[in-house]
Amino acid sequence: MSAKTNAKKKEQDKPQSSGLGLDGLGDLAGLLNEQPAANAGGAGPQELPLDLIDEDPHQPRTADNPGFSPESIAEIGETIKARGVKSPISVRENPDAPGRYLINHGARRYRGSKWAHKTTIPAFIDNDYNEADQVIENLQRNELTAREIADFIGRELAKGKKKGEIAKEIGKSPAFVTQHVTLLDLPEPIAEAFNSGRGKDVTVINELVTAYKKNPDEVAAWLADDSQELTRGSVKLLREFLEDKRSHDDGDRDPNTVDALTGKTDAEAGDGEQGPQDDDAKGKKEPKEADPDKLKKAIIQVKHDDRPARLILNRRPPAEGWAWLKYEDDGQEFEADLGTVQLVALLEG
């Protein structure tokens, strides 16, 4: 047999390729069996073992959050037991414990899964996550208490951030931040009512603080009545009562009130001891004609967060470009960036 014939026979004896490149299928199958490293840039969730996941010790929600109550966890646990976790949680790699993960958001689903005796949970891995992201997530779900929001803002202020920066970071108004900052340093009677859960409305607490600054004893006595409901309506009535009382104390007394020192009524004291000759000597002053081009009392009406308000002109603002405002509907007083305020009208009071 010639050399050419032998070469042709050897070529025929070789395994034939399909032409589709499937002869490397074994290697491809091996690649498919390999797990991606932490799915760092993966598009979908993966099942992670629950025993490799830890809750973030710095998460904004605290242990006494209503969503963490045993009853609440049992409720979500029952649904997970029956239907599983339909919305994956978000985690990030734990920098202090390689191979483990910290929860970005989804702590209730995590606890509910443990309650239901699950061993894994669907999760997205997102390493680009910070505390502000956690706050935003929970704010959008209305899952943070006012105290938790205030504590977060306090931590951000301690880092040197300004209220306006924090407001922009979490997608809220500067007034929202200012209201919650008030919760960090409450007068004792108001702090007791707030911490006990009697007053949860941030607006109500801010209104009480404003009233307390002018009438601490009266507000403390009002709060001492445990049966007193803390609502916007009740606090508005309290402030109106205190304002009326203060106006009477400032001189609008009954003219027949007897002065304890002189023994005379206000009307008698007002007559004085001067005779008619004194009046003639002093002469009568003609009332000065009012200037029609000047306002006796200016009222500047504005709009803030789509709510009617007015500028408080006799209170010093905290900084340039800021001012004190008062909402027309509930009387709440607060600081606001003038960049968020729309001028509506200038009236005479």
Curated annotation (Swiss-Prot):
InterPro entries: Chromosome_partition/occlusion (IPR050336), KorB_C (IPR010575), KorB_C_sf (IPR037048), KorB_DNA-db (IPR042075), KorB_domain (IPR013741), ParB/RepB/Spo0J (IPR004437), ParB/Sulfiredoxin_dom (IPR003115), ParB/Sulfiredoxin_sf (IPR036086). Residues 25-40 have a biased composition (Low complexity). Pfam families: KorB, KorB_C, ParBc. It comes from the Bacteria. GO terms for cellular component: chromosome. GO terms for molecular function: DNA binding. Residues 1-72, 246-296 are annotated as: Disordered. One of its GO terms (biological process) is chromosome segregation. Residues 246-256, 279-296 have a biased composition (Basic and acidic residues). Keywords: DNA-binding, Plasmid, Repressor, Transcription, Transcription regulation. Belongs to the ParB family. PANTHER family: CHROMOSOME-PARTITIONING PROTEIN PARB-RELATED. In conjunction with KorA, inhibits the transcription of the kilA, trfA and korAB operons. Is also involved in the negative control of the kilB operon. This is Transcriptional repressor protein KorB. The lineage of its organism: Bacteria, Pseudomonadati, Pseudomonadota, Gammaproteobacteria, Enterobacterales.
